[in-house]
């Protein structure tokens, strides 16, 4: 187990091999969506994005480029999105926190390629970043062919004016304004002042 970025939460690290095969076997997601919908809730499932998942994975055995697995992994995401759409889900949040890291150009290119392929899938997609600002990846994130972008204003409030300038008007902008990492109450008046700028 490894720490999830700079949090006190841990996750099981995926172990990846050059001949890795992927299949969709996680029914719990779809069962929980059905249950929530049956209770009358609007559902927005959250999944770890394909690039973040590969980035965090560990090579097992002989070294290889983890991005070589992307073309095998993307159809699984397509299956997930198709099944969620068939259940009546309108939006899916795709967490890509590695967009807040200093990424090699090869990974930036992979983001563009992956999301160009995923844009064909039937649900609306909100790419979410957190733990830091987008920095040099702001243009990349704003330009991805998705329906919305979530940014962290608690850790990186300085990115707000720039993202307002760069994000196309037809995209939804979601703002992380409540600090979930401490016990202190959020200053709602201050948050409202920030939100009114959008």
Model regions and ranges:
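Domain-level signal for soluble alpha/beta catalytic cores
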Residues: 1-198
């Amino acid at each position: 187990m490894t720490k999830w970025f700079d949090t006190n939460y841990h996750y099981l690290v995926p172990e990846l091999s050059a001949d890795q095969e992927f299949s969709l076997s996680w029914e719990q997601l779809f069962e929980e969506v059905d249950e929530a919908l049956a209770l009358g809730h609007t559902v927005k499932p959250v999944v770890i994005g394909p690039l973040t998942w590969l980035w965090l994975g560990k090579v097992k055995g002989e070294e290889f480029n983890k991005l070589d697995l992307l073309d095998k992994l993307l159809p699984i995401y397509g299956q997930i999105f198709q099944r969620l759409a068939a259940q009546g889900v309108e939006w899916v949040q795709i967490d890509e926190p590695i967009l807040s890291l200093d990424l090699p150009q090869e990974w930036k290119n992979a983001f563009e390629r992956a999301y160009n392929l995923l844009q064909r899938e039937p649900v609306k997609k909100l790419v979410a970043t957190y733990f830091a600002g987008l920095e040099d990846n702001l243009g990349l994130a704003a330009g991805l062919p998705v329906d919305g972008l979530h940014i962290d204003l608690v850790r990186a409030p300085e990115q707000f004016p720039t993202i307002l300038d760069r994000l196309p008007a037809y995209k939804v902008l979601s703002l992380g304004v409540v600090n979930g990492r401490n016990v202190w109450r959020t200053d709602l008046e201050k948050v409202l002042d920030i939100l009114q700028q959008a």
